[in-house]
Curated annotation (Swiss-Prot):
Residues 150-250 form the BACK domain. It holds the Pfam family Kelch_1. InterPro entries: BACK (IPR011705), BTB-kelch_protein (IPR017096), BTB/POZ_dom (IPR000210), BTB/POZ_KBTBD3 (IPR030589), KBTBD3_BACK (IPR047062), Kelch-typ_b-propeller (IPR015915), Kelch_1 (IPR006652), SKP1/BTB/POZ_sf (IPR011333). Residues 52-119 form the BTB domain. Signal peptide: none annotated. CDD domains: BACK_KBTBD3, BTB_POZ_KBTBD3_BKLHD3. Keywords: Kelch repeat, Repeat. Kelch repeats lie at residues 291-337, 339-390, 400-450, 452-502, 548-595. It comes from Pongo abelii. It comes from the Eukaryota. The gene is KBTBD3. SMART domains: BACK, BTB, Kelch. This is Kelch repeat and BTB domain-containing protein 3. The keyword Repeat applies.
Length: 612
């Protein structure tokens, strides 16, 4: 206790000294353990059975207590005493859903501020803290149970947290169940899971299953476990199965084996529609769960002579490369390549004899740009034309957002002095239609585009050619694909960049740029419009490829000089700001196409015979 004494003796007037009023003083009393002392006094009252003003009536016992303690500790009791409730005036409340042991444990905690949570009593404390709305105790129980989640109790904890409204425990238990789903779905506890919790499990991208077929089997098994009461839920659960990721054979088998159940629950037509969808647009759905897919980096290069082609893929999981069979991709000079689902789209380019090297291509006197769009299906090793763009274009960029392919910038057919295109188009792979969207705010050359959720960022230069060829990076646009709106951002990079020497990549919905001239990586904060230095990589060739995958950036190949091309591959781990070198490409390359693509494991065309 700290005590400051006032030396003045008059309360209503100031003292004087030789006719001069003295300065008035203040008293401050601070007792750091005041609250604990009050608790101790109240606990003494409880032990002495004095000053009680309220009673909790149990089935087998009446427990006296103090209103102030109940109201201070429990939102349930505070609300009861604040509102004009019968219990407030009667001075008692009857509680039937808690045991006397639980209520006494609560009162011990309320009067002392102390309790011990154990494996034996945690559920009791969790129940009473939920009912009596004791937030601190509820959080303590939740934290205790989160640390104990395992394969034996996770389903029970998921159910408990759902019943008691503990968001934190529910989220942790749900994540654990989703991660170990394939080990749990055959258990008895799983079959007793309620509809709402099962629905939350199934809708997650992170559901860890080896194939989507397992999700369909789980839905059917859970429904049949108590068919009479659960069949009404089947249409809702079927919607959570990504039916278009299943094979046609699997869907046909489901129709044959479950015809009666599907028809009685109005799900037969849902499966029929999925079969039509798979037949007509199989491989064009990018929503496969990560656990059901294999991810690759796809590399393609056509030499200047237009005849020699090099195509290979890198398996992310196994850190291994595979040289792919001849695909005969028609990648014209100045064309752009983007992946979508299990397909690859090539747009535009020059039909004439333009040089492929960007430095020489840009200086050609005439560009015979095409409006053609090609689709490559690696599963069938098939390459075919789809709908043409509205405007021929070359030296543009393409990127996927909101399940559509956007083509941005570039130049159309004509002489070299034609300005860059402002027109922007988007292609729907399912409807096979091109539409025009809002145009660019102004012209841009050497565009680099990356998608972060629904936003497309485009970086480039406002000039095409400078004396040193390397134009500065001075254009920075943002396009909201959901609202079809462009905005121009201030390119405050903090230092000078060359437009042709940076690579823009998305990592975990954050935009990064890799500067191939200074070997540095920067991330962009959309709230402040500021670029932040994230670290440096050891080296990188000019014209290297760059790809963002999950929390990693891959930088591949490139050239240090016309006759010095590298096959090196470096990986930047953004979550720990570290670089490492992984398996090199099968061949040294510069100025090549580089995209991420993934396949359902059951139809992965590149899985076997991977070579390091």
């Amino acid at each position: 206790m700290e005590l400051a004494m006032d030396n003045s003796y008059a309360f209503n007037q100031r003292s004087t000294c030789n006719g001069i009023p003295s300065e008035k003083k203040n008293n401050f009393l601070v007792s750091e353990d005041h609250g604990q002392k009050i608790l101790s006094v109240l606990q003494n009252f409880r032990e002495q059975n004095v000053f009680y003003d309220f009673k909790i009536i149990m089935k087998d016992e009446i427990i006296p207590c103090h209103r102030c303690v109940l109201a201070a500790c429990s939102d349930f009791f505070r609300a009861m005493f604040e509102v004009n409730m019968k219990e407030r005036d009667d001075g008692s409340v009857t509680i039937t859903n808690l045991s006397s042991k639980a209520v006494k444990a609560f009162l011990d905690y309320a009067y002392t501020g102390k309790t011990k949570i154990t494996d034996d009593n945690v559920e009791m404390f969790f129940q009473l803290s939920s009912f009596l709305q004791v937030s601190f105790l509820s959080k303590a129980c939740s934290d205790f149970l989160i640390k104990s989640i395992n394969l034996v109790n996770c389903l029970q904890l998921l159910s408990i947290s759902d019943s008691y409204g503990s968001t934190s425990l529910f989220d942790h238990a749900l994540h654990f169940v989703q991660h170990h789903f394939s080990l749990l779905f055959k258990s008895g506890d799983f079959l007793e899971m309620n509809f709402g919790v099962l629905q939350k499990c199934l809708e997650s991208d992170e559901l860890n299953v080896p194939e989507e077929e397992m999700v369909l089997k789980v839905v059917l098994s859970w429904t049949k476990h108590n068919l009479e009461s659960r069949q009404k839920y089947l249409p809702h659960l079927i919607e959570k199965v990504r039916l278009h990721q299943l094979s046609e054979e699997t869907l046909q088998d489901c129709l044959f084996n479950e015809e009666s159940l599907l028809k009685s629950t109005n799900c037969f037509d849902i499966i029929m529609d999925a079969i039509k969808c798979v037949k007509g647009s199989g491989g064009l759905f990018p929503d496969a769960r990560p656990s059901t897919t294999e991810k690759y980096i796809f590399i393609h290069k056509t030499e200047e002579n237009g005849e020699n082609q090099y195509t290979f893929c890198y398996n992310i999981k196994s850190d291994s490369w595979k040289i792919l069979p001849q695909s005969h991709l028609i990648d014209l000079p100045g064309s752009s390549l983007s992946s979508y689902g299990e397909k690859i789209f090539l747009t535009g380019g020059c039909k004439g004899k333009c040089c492929r090297t960007i430095r020489l291509h840009i200086a050609e006197s005439y560009h015979d740009a095409t409006d053609q769009t090609w689709c490559y299906c690696p599963v069938k090793n098939d390459f075919f034309l789809v709908s043409t763009m509205k405007t021929p274009r070359t030296m543009h960029t393409s990127v996927m957002a909101l399940d559509r392919l956007f083509v941005i910038g570039g130049k159309t057919r004509g002489s070299r002095d034609i300005k860059s295109l402002l027109d922007v188009e988007s292609y729907n792979p399912l409807s096979k239609e091109w539409i025009s969207v809002s145009p660019l705010p102004r012209g841009i050359y050497y565009p680099e585009a990356s998608t972060c959720q629904n936003v497309i960022y485009v970086l480039g230069s406002e000039v095409e050619i400078t004396d040193a060829f390397n134009p500065s990076l001075d254009c920075f646009f943002k396009y909201n694909a959901a609202t079809d709106q462009w905005s121009e951002l201030v390119a405050e990079f903090g230092q000078f960049f060359h437009a042709t020497l940076i690579k823009a990549v998305p990592v975990n919905c954050t935009l990064y740029i890799c500067d191939l001239s200074t070997y540095k990586v920067y991330s962009f904060c959309p709230d402040t419009c500021v670029w932040k230095g994230e670290g440096s990589f050891e080296c990188a060739g000019f014209n290297a490829g760059a790809i963002g995958i999950e929390d990693k950036i891959y930088i591949l190949g490139g050239d240090y000089a016309p006759d010095e091309i590298t096959d090196e591959v470096q990986v930047y781990h953004s979550n720990r700001s570290e670089w490492e070198e992984v398996s090199p490409m099968p061949r040294a390359l510069t100025e090549f196409y580089c995209q991420v693509i993934q396949f359902n494991k059951y139809r992965d065309p590149w899985f076997s015979n991977l070579c390091a």
